[in-house]
From Swiss-Prot:
<dbReference type="Pfam" id="PF14551">
    <property type="entry name" value="MCM_N"/>
</dbReference>
<dbReference type="Pfam" id="PF17855">
    <property type="entry name" value="MCM_lid"/>
</dbReference>
<dbReference type="InterPro" id="IPR003593">
    <property type="entry name" value="AAA+_ATPase"/>
</dbReference>
<dbReference type="InterPro" id="IPR012340">
    <property type="entry name" value="NA-bd_OB-fold"/>
</dbReference>
<protein>
    <recommendedName>
        <fullName>Maternal DNA replication licensing factor mcm3</fullName>
        <ecNumber>3.6.4.12</ecNumber>
    </recommendedName>
</protein>
<dbReference type="GO" id="GO:0017116">
    <property type="term" value="F:single-stranded DNA helicase activity"/>
</dbReference>
<keyword id="KW-0131">Cell cycle</keyword>
<dbReference type="GO" id="GO:0006279">
    <property type="term" value="P:premeiotic DNA replication"/>
</dbReference>
<dbReference type="InterPro" id="IPR041562">
    <property type="entry name" value="MCM_lid"/>
</dbReference>
<dbReference type="GO" id="GO:0006271">
    <property type="term" value="P:DNA strand elongation involved in DNA replication"/>
</dbReference>
<dbReference type="InterPro" id="IPR027417">
    <property type="entry name" value="P-loop_NTPase"/>
</dbReference>
<comment type="function">
    <text>Acts as a component of the mcm2-7 complex (mcm complex) which is the putative replicative helicase essential for 'once per cell cycle' DNA replication initiation and elongation in eukaryotic cells. The active ATPase sites in the mcm2-7 ring are formed through the interaction surfaces of two neighboring subunits such that a critical structure of a conserved arginine finger motif is provided in trans relative to the ATP-binding site of the Walker A box of the adjacent subunit. The six ATPase active sites, however, are likely to contribute differentially to the complex helicase activity.</text>
</comment>
<dbReference type="GO" id="GO:0044786">
    <property type="term" value="P:cell cycle DNA replication"/>
</dbReference>
<keyword id="KW-0235">DNA replication</keyword>
<keyword id="KW-0378">Hydrolase</keyword>
<keyword id="KW-0238">DNA-binding</keyword>
<dbReference type="GO" id="GO:0005634">
    <property type="term" value="C:nucleus"/>
</dbReference>
Length: 807
């Protein structure tokens, strides 16, 4: 009998014997003998064999396996069944056949869908790509048993097609009558079926030639390989390349359809959980103890070290990566633990770069953009299967990022309809679909990090934050923190940013050749299913800090060290396992401060805040406190955690930290009162001397024991003597150019005056009253005139006939 590859019976037996010798290595290292025993113990029927081991022991068989895969695989599978029968005979009878999967180095047979050519037909190949489509899993009949009630006989039939390893496919006609035309009944319980699925994989976009569409290839997966991967996964699939004749109108055409019969599927996607060693955990604990007081600042400064500044935003991103505690109450209510952050600001303030850093740091992160995403693309869509015509559900970005982070850039470019679709996800953490007869609920417990530009392109200082943001309150309240990032003109800060950016451009990664740039996100290709250096990576020591480099860390002699991204990733993974408990002290503090924030919001008439202060702000403070406690590896949430959370909330809501005013201790207040008392006593002494001189020149009609008269006269004399001096000084100041601080104060007061008057033009006399209302240091008319002249030169205001117009 011929077995497809020109194998006679004696050649097949010879190959089977050699493969049996390879597997039965009990006298040698016992590697595959142990693997077969593990396979029996776990009730499986597929053994994964490394081609490098076959090549080491029998080079001839390894080459034949790559070039004539059908016959060699049949021989290998029979050898495996013989070995299983010798170890456990009863287990060998449970399965029709035992399968073999391959891994290791494939050399020239390691290809992409574009490089699959006719010369590789019948060969064992390894194909890399992205899964684009998965069909439904369907049963495929392998052996059917039929019973004839008339003759009391049973009939058995085996089936094989071109997707099996058999050389000659059997007839696909399903028997319904026997030779004498007696009807047959199918015994479904005795028939044998196996799972069958079709996949399509496409070549990776970064490896496709520029300007050409990526190519794809169909994969046939059977038995235990079904549902090994889902659409979007990057995979390496090892299998036998085969062609199938395509029929058109009942006739076989000259062109063939090619498929890959898979025997091993390996995911290339990033592992969600990093690998840990005992030394790694010990280093994390030691690092936490060494920086117990400033660990939050230390880690947040090391986030995105290539971006200068943005301290509070980096702290918020660190809290977002850690998250709070999710709670599901007895009545079914879910309190989310995910932290959502929105960045709004001028162009070129590194918003997108922060998003890019989170994509590389978070264990699972999905990037999307505002214009490139629709509502169903973010949540879920109901589509029609082209093969069967059935409706099916396709998961969107937020469902794929379950327990991860979704980064949405250009959030303001999305339509209102699409933005409304994510309301449920951001608060409830799930997507509910009721379309086309499908009622489904999908989990989407993810944090949202979004970046947007203001309504007018750039932030307008003369409008309220709510007018600049231009998003609905219902959406804004679902974001825990909203940061307004402004591109302020400051010479010192601009100089620091310029130095920092230029250093980044001069910095070069170790091992990079002169004049050669690696493609973005690309590394050296390895033509094997496993990286030979992978064991070295896991065994090498975990570096806590980045190695010092003058270009990366700067020329200044600062002692600040940057924590490495690998260490931060592992630290976050360990810290997320802790579930801190809220203490009564922290709970009382949070409730008091929440009431103060609501009160401050009401007093300021909503003009200063960036987003509505609702009951969700209370949950935000609890979540941020929990995240800060996780950074400290603490099992309880204490007052210091709540204070840090309050700082972040105040900075996000009011663009400034309000708590600094309230942090004065009793000693500070006592010292302040003493200094005020001494100042008033000195002024009284000076005025009394002057008053004494005046009194000597006048009649001595004052009663020395009448203290009230004395005080009133002293105060009167003091005010009279100080008033002309102050006016004189102020007039002298008015002649000189206004100081920078005084100009800033005037601009802020002018903006407040225009907001209170609610008009675009105000008379100068009325403006003077509005500016000096409640101002401890009132502005003189000359100061106002000079400041208005300066602003008019800068095209910020226009003054005409003593009326100020806001441009």
């Amino acid at each position: 009998m011929d077995y497809g590859g020109g194998f006679e019976d004696h050649e097949l037996r010879e190959a089977q014997r050699e493969y049996l010798d390879f597997l039965d290595d009990d006298q040698d290292q016992g590697l595959y003998h142990g693997k077969v025993r593990d396979m029996i113990g776990s009730n499986e029927h597929r053994l994964i064999v490394n081609l490098n081991d076959v090549r080491r022991k029998n080079d001839k068989r390894a080459n034949l396996m790559l070039n004539d895969a059908f016959a060699e695989t049949i021989a290998f599978q029979r050898a495996l069944k013989d070995l299983v029968a010798s170890i456990d005979a009863t287990y060998a009878k449970q399965f029709e056949e035992f399968s073999v999967g391959f891994e290791g180095s494939f050399g020239s047979k390691h290809v992409s869908p574009r490089t699959l050519t006719a010369s590789l037909l019948g060969s064992l190949v390894c194909v890399e790509g992205i899964v684009t489509k998965c069909s439904l899993v369907r049963p495929k009949v392998m052996r059917s048993v039929h019973y004839c009630p008339a003759t009391k006989k049973t009939l058995e039939r085996k089936y094989s097609d071109l997707t099996s390893l058999e050389a000659f496919p059997s007839s696909s006609i399903y028997p319904t009558k026997d030779e004498e035309n007696n009807p047959l009944e199918t015994e479904y319980g005795l028939s044998t079926y196996k799972d069958h699925q079709t996949l399509s994989i496409q070549e990776m976009p970064e490896k496709a030639p520029a300007g050409q569409l990526p190519r794809s290839v169909d994969i046939i997966a059977d038995d235990d390989l079904v549902d090994k991967c889902k659409p979007g996964d990057r995979v390496q699939i090892v299998g036998i390349y085969r062609c199938l004749p395509s029929k058109q109108g009942g006739f076989t055409s000259g062109t063939f359809r090619t498929i890959l019969l898979a025997n091993n599927i390996k995911l290339m996607s990033k592992e969600i959980a990093p690998t840990f060693s005992a030394d790694d955990v010990a280093k994390i604990k030691k690092f936490c103890k060494a920086h117990s007081k400033d660990i939050f600042e230390h880690l947040s400064k090391s986030l995105a070290p290539s971006i200068h500044g943005h301290e509070y935003i980096k702290k918020a991103i660190l809290c977002m990566l850690l998250g709070g505690n999710e709670k599901v109450l007895e009545n079914g209510t879910r309190i989310r633990g995910d932290i959502n952050v929105l960045l709004i600001g001028d162009p070129s303030v590194a918003k997108s770069q922060l998003l890019r850093y989170v994509l590389h740091t978070a264990p699972r992160a999905i990037p999307t953009t505002g214009r490139g995403s629709s509502g169903v693309g973010l949540t879920a869509a109901v589509t029609t299967d082209q093969e069967t015509g059935e409706r099916r559900l396709e998961a969107g970005a937020m469902v794929l990022a379950d327990r991860g982070v979704v980064c949405i850039d250009e959030f303001d470019k999305m339509s209102d309809m699409d933005r409304t679709a994510i309301h449920e996800v951001m608060e409830q953490g799930r997507v509910t679909i009721a379309k086309a007869g499908i009622q489904a609920r999908l989990n989407a417990r993810c944090s949202v990090l979004a970046a947007a530009n203001p309504v007018y392109g750039r932030y307008d200082q003369y409008r309220t934050p709510m007018e600049n943001i231009g998003l609905q309150d219902s959406l804004l309240s679902r974001f825990d923190l909203l940061f307004i990032v402004l591109d302020k003109m400051d010479a010192d800060n601009d100089q620091e940013i310029a130095d920092h950016v230029l250093r980044m451009h001069r910095y070069r990664t170790p091992g990079e050749q002169d004049g050669y740039a690696l493609p973005l996100g690309c590394s050296v290709e390895i033509f094997a299913t496993d990286d030979p250096n992978a064991s070295d990576v896991t065994d090498q020591e975990l570096q806590i800090y980045e190695k010092h480099d003058n270009l990366l860390h700067g020329p200044r002699k600062n002692k600040s060290k940057i924590v490495s991204m690998q260490f931060i990733r592992k630290y976050i993974h360990v810290a997320k396992l802790i579930k801190p408990v809220l203490t009564s002290e922290a709970a009382d503090y949070i409730s008091q401060e929440y009431a103060k924030i609501r009160n401050h919001d009401q007093i300021n008439n909503d003009s200063a805040r960036t987003m509505p202060v609702t009951a969700r702000a209370l949950e935000t403070m609890i979540r941020l406190s929990t995240a800060h406690a996780k950074v400290r590896m603490s099992k309880t949430i204490e007052r210091q955690d709540a204070e840090t959370a309050l700082e972040l909330v105040q900075f996000a809501y009011f663009k400034k930290v309000l708590a600094k005013e309230k942090k004065k201790t009793d000693k500070d207040l006592h010292d302040e009162n003493l200094s005020q008392d001494t100042l008033s006593q000195e002024s009284v002494r000076k005025s009394s001397r002057r008053a004494g001189k005046i009194a000597d020149s006048q009649d001595d009609s004052m009663d020395p024991y009448s203290f009230s008269e004395q005080d009133s006269s002293l105060n009167e004399n003091l005010s009279q003597s100080l008033r002309p001096q102050r006016k004189k000084a102020e007039s002298q100041d008015g002649k000189r150019s206004l100081s920078q601080n005084r100009t800033k104060e005037f601009k802020a007061a002018l903006l407040k005056a225009f907001k209170s008057s609610r008009s675009q033009s105000v008379a100068v006399s009325q403006l003077l009253e509005l500016i000096n209302k409640g101002n401890p240091e009132p502005f003189e008319r000359s100061e106002v005139k000079e400041a208005l002249d300066n602003m008019q030169n800068d095209n910020q205001v226009m003054v005409s006939e003593d009326v100020v117009f806001l441009i």
